[in-house]
Amino acid sequence: MEETPQHCLSRLPDNSALKQQELPAHRLYFTARRVLFVFFTTGIFCLCMGIILILSARSTQEIEINYTRICANCAKLRENASNFDKECTCSIPFYLSGKMMGNVYMYYKLYGFYQNLYRYVRSRSNRQLVGKDVKAVEDCAPFKMSDNKTPIVPCGAIANSMFNDTIILSHNINSSVQIKVPMLKSGLTWWTDKYVKFQNPSSKNLADEFRGTTKPPNWPKPIYDLDKKDPRNNGFLNDDFIVWMRAAAFPTFKKLYGRLNRTHHFIEGLPAGNYSFNITYNFPVTRFQGEKSVVLSTLTWCGGNSLFLGLAYTVTGAITWLASFTMMAIHITLKNKQMSFFHQ
């Protein structure tokens, strides 16, 4: 018998289960019963989740007021870009029939505004927004430089078109007494946006840091002077600015504008009664046949008054169940045919 050379034996793998590929293995074996069980279970789960989410969304309190036509004079004024420096205000009274308990949030809602256009979304400078280089405007066409070649901060189309209506909610106790409802302008953003994606330059004096730059054409004041009441809410860390810069996926969307400061008269929420929205109308929507609304809403554990997620679960569950019954019918039919074949 011919012996194996010593140098060949040295190359042989160890006689272990791992190296000899003898580890125990499990091969999935899909039977009709197992597949049907998985489909039925998934369908039941999705249907139950969908019903729970829909009922939860229905339990929120929400009031929406479209003020595009109510403030028609202001809308017409804003159609002409040359009137941008002319102030226009309107007051919208409304009645809140029931108390809005707990935390109440104010949103602005836009119709027909396509924030998801590729060139629009890409027209921004992330290097600028994280405070690394405030004069980095390479990706911001067509809003990179002003007419006198000064860098625009914040640059880009999405920043230039920021929503700039001022909305004040007032509680009308009677014909002579009106209380301004306190709204907080902080805590409106996602944590990752506030502390990762947006940062101010290292200098504490933002005016000095932004020297040599100019504001976007549609902005009334520069980025470092957006909030006179709260110095921390200025620069790239301004909550309204961060909320606007998160582009919406659909042409109809709402964005958080403020949240109720539950103090004094509003500790439990918004009491029922007469209210009014006092709006400084700046953001033009009639140019693109759009509309805008202001929304007051409460939240539940799964969010606001949105049926999208609940309907998605319900439709998925219904389709899964339909597929389950179809597969079960096919399985029974084939099984009966097979049995009749053997009985022949």
Curated annotation (Swiss-Prot):
Tissues expressing this chain: Specifically expressed in testis.
Stated family: Belongs to the CDC50/LEM3 family.
Alphabetized PANTHER family for the sequence: CELL CYCLE CONTROL PROTEIN 50, CELL CYCLE CONTROL PROTEIN 50C
Main localization category: membrane
Subcellular location as annotated: Membrane
Protein name, UniProt field: Cell cycle control protein 50C
TM region positions: 35-55, 307-327
Gene it is expressed from: TMEM30C
Glycosylation: residue positions: 66, 261
Keyword list, A-Z: Glycoprotein, Membrane, Transmembrane, Transmembrane helix
Pfam (any one): CDC50
Cytoplasmic topology ranges: 1-34, 328-344
Listed GO CC annotations: endoplasmic reticulum; Golgi apparatus; plasma membrane
InterPro entries: CDC50/LEM3_fam (IPR005045)
Membrane topology, from the record: Multi-pass membrane protein
Topological domain spans for side Extracellular: 56-306
Biological processes per GO annotation: phospholipid translocation
